[in-house]
């Protein structure tokens, strides 16, 4: 459970020496507040307080300017889970969480179709009831743009399997985005916002067809919902996770 910091200005990684850090885990999710140096982390699968492996529902904030982790013990929030996705909402200033796989209130394991918003100021989670949603889903990824469009792609849906639909969350509502061109069904891909061009970039992932590892680069416009496959002169080797 080490913490590393990447510094853009000198292209260098440095190990953090924060004393109180989250326990070792995987398949957690994180999102950074664009207006500050804070990063919000929730959930994952790893050691709990009694030393057993379990789905986690703890919320942590990392203050990059102070190299400090702080657990928000009274944040409330989603049920224990992993394989969920989180993204920053540039309009509300909240961090939005959707879906994942874990344990519900009755102790049964399931995929989730719930939407939550973490308020940076109050440091509380609030459940968002939406008219429709992208289904009980895990392994998906999300990223937001300057206009407050939080885009979701890929993952695994109960009753459907691995998915290739694109969804937009905006102002408390989910809508499916129709596009004739888009990536094939993916899981374990990376999805991040290009702040300079205000576009969302997807790279890699695990496909349903051979060769199973992807090295494709896709760009998504959050406003129009249009996808474009980018041909680059050089590319990282195909990968997932």
Positions of PLM-derived features:
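Kelch-like beta-propeller repeat domains
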Residues: 1-241
């Amino acid at each position: 459970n080490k913490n590393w910091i990447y510094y853009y200005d000198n292209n260098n990684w440095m190990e953090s020496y924060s004393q109180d850090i989250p326990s070792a885990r995987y398949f957690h999710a994180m999102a950074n507040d664009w207006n500050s140096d804070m990063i919000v982390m929730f959930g994952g699968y790893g050691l709990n307080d009694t030393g057993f492996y379990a789905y986690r529902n703890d919320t942590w904030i990392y203050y990059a300017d102070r190299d400090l982790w702080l657990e928000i013990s009274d944040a409330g929030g989603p049920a224990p889970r992993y394989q969920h996705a989180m993204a920053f909402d540039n309009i509300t200033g909240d961090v939005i969480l959707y879906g994942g796989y874990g344990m519900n209130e009755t102790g049964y394991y399931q995929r989730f179709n719930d939407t939550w918003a973490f308020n940076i100021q109050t440091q509380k989670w609030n459940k968002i009831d939406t008219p429709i949603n992208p289904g009980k889903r895990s392994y998906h990824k999300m990223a937001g743009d300057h206009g407050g469009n939080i885009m979701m792609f890929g993952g695994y849906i109960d009753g459907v399997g691995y998915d290739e639909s694109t969804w937009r969350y905006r102002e408390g509502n989910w809508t499916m985005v129709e596009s004739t061109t888009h990536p094939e069904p993916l899981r374990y891909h990376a999805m991040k916002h290009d702040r300079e061009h205000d576009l969302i970039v997807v790279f890699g992932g695990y496909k349903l067809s051979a060769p199973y590892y992807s090295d494709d680069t896709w760009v998504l416009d959050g406003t129009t919902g249009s996808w474009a496959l980018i041909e680059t002169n050089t590319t990282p080797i195909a990968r997932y996770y």
